[in-house]
A protein has these predicted regions:
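Glycine-rich phosphate/pyrophosphate-binding beta-alpha loops
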Residues: 83-90, 168-177
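Phosphate-binding site of ATP-dependent enzymes
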Residues: 2-132, 140-157
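Protein kinase-like catalytic core scaffold
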Residues: 78-79, 163-165
Length: 178
């Protein structure tokens, strides 16, 4: 397997067995191989109740263009933020250039309207029906070409689709809250 750590963009090569051992028992476990990652692995430790989880998420190559974070207060968008990584693929960890947009800005207005339309289905889909929306939360979108795209160049803005890569209410990055 070719694995990329999205926090610092380093690449490691491991067997499936080494990767699974890392995920279940950690980098120092017998059979895990040698890891450069600073993460402790053991992603399933404690089960769902303790937050143990592993997300199978495909790599979207257009992440190098950045991601769009929609900053929400309850059910109201406060701003859209384009986070463009300065190096590598990942906008994680603050090594990015940030551009801020008002919710009414045409660039992301349709995305925000779609999120508003989808809000009633979000909590039930996450088995949180009946719970209130978080006071402050974000939805991070990653650009992608439409399925079946065969052209050498990427889709233009009018054809680009977006995939939600994360909903977050624990570390929302509000340093530029307006």
């Amino acid at each position: 397997l070719k694995l990329m750590e999205m926090n610092d963009n380093h690449v490691e090569y491991h067997t499936v067995k080494e990767f699974l051992t890392f995920c279940v028992d950690g980098p120092d476990a017998p059979g895990a191989g040698t890891w450069k990652s600073t993460f402790p692995g053991k992603y399933l430790e404690g089960g769902k109740e303790a937050g143990g989880q592993l997300v199978d998420q495909r790599l979207l190559p257009r992440i190098d263009e950045g991601e769009v974070r929609i900053l929400m207060a309850g059910d109201t968008c406060q701003m859209a933020i384009h986070k463009k990584p300065l190096d590598g693929l990942s906008a994680v960890g603050g090594n990015s250039a940030y551009t801020y947009y008002k919710p009414t800005d045409e660039k992301y207005k349709k995305m925000i309207e779609t999120l508003y339309k989808d809000i009633p289905t979000l909590l039930p889909a996450m088995d949180l029906q009946g719970e209130p929306l978080p006071l402050l939360w974000t939805a991070d979108y990653i650009p992608k070409n439409p399925e079946g795209w065969s052209k050498a160049e990427n889709a233009d803005d009018s054809e680009t689709e977006y995939v939600v890569g994360e909903f977050n209410c624990s570390c929302v990055g509000i340093s530029k809250f307006q």
